[in-house]
Swiss-Prot record:
Physiological role: Multi-functional prenyltransferase; part of the gene cluster that mediates the biosynthesis of lolitrems, indole-diterpene mycotoxins that are potent tremorgens in mammals, and are synthesized by clavicipitaceous fungal endophytes in association with their grass hosts. The geranylgeranyl diphosphate (GGPP) synthase ltmG is proposed to catalyze the first step in lolitrem biosynthesis. LtmG catalyzes a series of iterative condensations of isopentenyl diphosphate (IPP) with dimethylallyl diphosphate (DMAPP), geranyl diphosphate (GPP), and farnesyl diphosphate (FPP), to form GGPP.
Conditions for induction: Expression is down-regulated when the stress-activated mitogen-activated protein kinase (sakA) is deleted.
Gene: ltmE
Phylogenetic classification of the source organism: Eukaryota, Fungi, Dikarya, Ascomycota, Pezizomycotina
Listed InterPro entries: Aro_prenylTrfase (IPR033964), Aro_prenylTrfase_DMATS (IPR017795), Isoprenoid_synthase_dom_sf (IPR008949), Polyprenyl_synt (IPR000092)
Coiled-coil stretches: none
Named cofactor requirement(s): Mg(2+)
A GO biological process held by the record: alcohol biosynthetic process
Superkingdom of the organism of origin: Eukaryota
Binding site for substrate: K18, H51, R67, K151, T152, Q182, N189, K199, R427, R599, K601, Y603, Y687
Molecular function terms, GO-annotated: metal ion binding; prenyltransferase activity
Residues given in the record as L-tryptophan binding sites: M404, A405
Protein name listed in UniProt: Multi-functional prenyltransferase ltmE
Biological pathway: Secondary metabolite biosynthesis
Amino acid sequence: MKPTTRCPFDYLVSQCGKHHFKTFVQLLSPLLQDEDPDRYALILDIMDAVHFSAILIDDIANQSALRRNQPAAHVVFGETETATRAYLVLLRVVNRTMRENPVLAGELLNSLEEIHQGQDESLVWRRDGLETFPVADDERLAAYVRMSRLKTGSLFVLLGRLLANGGTEFDDLLVRFGLYAQLQHDCKNIYSPEYALNKGSVAEDLRNGELSYPVVVALIENKAEGIVGEALRTRSDGDTEQALRVLESPAVKDACLHALEAASVGLEDLVEAWGRREKMRSDTLDGDDLTRPSTITQHEQDDHVDRAAIDAKSDASGSSNKSLTPPETAPTTDTLSETAVGDISSVDVDYWTRRCVPIIGSLLKSCRVYSEAERETQLRFLQEHVLPNLGPRPSSPGSQIQSMATFSGFPLQPSINLSGSGQAKVRYTFEPLDSLSGTEVDPFALAPAQRVLEKLSTLLGVWPGWIDALIAAYHPTREEVEQLHPNLHEYLRGVLVRTTGRQDVQVPPMPRMWVCFVALDLEGASQALKVYFDPKIKEAVTGIPSCKYTCQILRTVDRFGNAKAVDMLEQFLAEEHSIGAVELIAIDCVPEEMQPSARIKVYVHTMSNSFQTVRKYMTMGGRCMDPATLEGLENLHDVWYSLLGESQGIVNEEYSKPLTGFSSMQHHLYFSYEMTPGNADPGVKVYIPVQSYAPDDKTIAQNYEANFRQLNWPWGEPGVYEAVIESALGPVKHSRATFLHGGSSFIFSKGRGVYQSIYLDPPLEEGGNIAVFEHHDDQDTIVDLGNM
């Protein structure tokens, strides 16, 4: 699929629509299009250039993550390119106007000066708080009106001057409307949950220190100099929340909404033409939509977004002006009402209980680090919070979708994590699904993913900022799903052709792409949350390579601040011609006080498994040559032959072992680059799809035991690892089409030495029958490593 946008300006126009002022032109000068089509076209292009360029710069200044519930242009293209394009568009339209109509060019330049003068005045107030703002009530209101007349009114006056060929007959009308438009914007920013959803932040103006109309009213009506002034000065979350409560008090809110209603009198036609239908509700104004005089339809009432949910999310996250879309109101789920939640049946939950609890229970016991009470707690958590979110059982009447968490289609992937002396812990990853997943209502299973993330982040007490940010960045909108769905096969085939260099690739049937995996590390009786996102969906719908898109996103993520590591990764992948190789994005989800140690991980693929490739990607082309990295490479070199199933060893570091053909979608290797806030040196982990280099699970088990012996781990004793797997998943010698093993990862750090993870793919039986292997929860089936 070809890119849908060429630059930040075109990207914004694609979101908002071309010729934004067309209805105004037709209302104020209905004959212009027929009488002077050239001037008509020029006026529309001038207004688009001025309006959209201002939006591009505003979004940068406000650090807005979203625009109309999609990533803002600077998030996608970067701040420098976005600002440069905005000014380039303005310069071009000025030059064009000077050539085609010098009279209009003069009006355009005058208006641009006034617009920027008003914006400058607003930014000075933002910088200085109340220090340079008038003290007297009437002077404060007059200052606000003057700023509004310049910043917003000049835009509409420009339209009138262009229509009147430099005349002033529309000035009074459009000055009034400019004030209305500014009031409307300021009120929506505080009082409209729908607007907050589209912008990805509640009360963005207040959090940025903007002296908007509700702030001015609060200063006048409530004499709230102390509370509001402190919020403007400190910009702290606590002070901002106190100020927001003042702005949302009935006295301030009703005064603002009454002023907005009064400003619209006599402008009804212009108000209707302007649109901006986000709803605002007042405690004393009968819930009317105060953005326009017409009545709210029942459909609009049904679509109303619960402000309390957004506020609760902001409170939980301590959100700043960059806080992003709450999971329950993220893209595409606006069509799913609460009654449309696709809960699965108790029969389905019972099926997953029978399938999953014995597997996790067996692995917990085999690790010998979990007490009986801890195992019971972990299994109870699994049953209460995970199993109801695995979707319908396979081939049941309501089954619509097969999980993409494993190659077998099983929706939960257990893994065993070994480190240091070989001590093992359990982890599992699952794809949230429900009975509507895969249907026309929710073909990509977005709703259960966002619902589960919200519930788990609240339950586990984690800071949701990164979750919200990446939902906004990577989860597709409804329109993007509709765009991608029929073209998915074409996109996937194009990816395979590019990565393999072959035209004869076969793309397996894939009705969708995954949007979210949830992982839980089991630490004693507690759980550590990680979340994975697929960047390929945005690559498919925007045409922006996954690496470029991801790096732009990471540079704007709140409380990350690691542009140096991001730049290093982007430069390295560009050198390797791998800008489309980013396959996964993962985040640690931790309590707010632990956020400085949280990781963001970027996963990339390679089409070679030679150790030369490993060395290049582990050192990022020689950029990371610290002692820990080099020691890790030495340790990995010692076990590399066993991970690739080469029992005789590998002499030539340039040797790349061919894949077995297990899956045409499988790459040779994966690497993850782990970045923490402020740390410029990423940790690098290599992932080996062992099922692509071995004939069967029996061989893989033997290779792992050789691997563990090389590291002097107790699981390397003959038959030990194999017994662990068989006690959980059944015989390693089987005739199924899919493997029990899903891959292995390897990383080395100075603190804990080698850290290796073994990923498992439980078999997916059809019809809900457990026919392949019957689990037993008696001690004889559990491998005891306590005396080894």
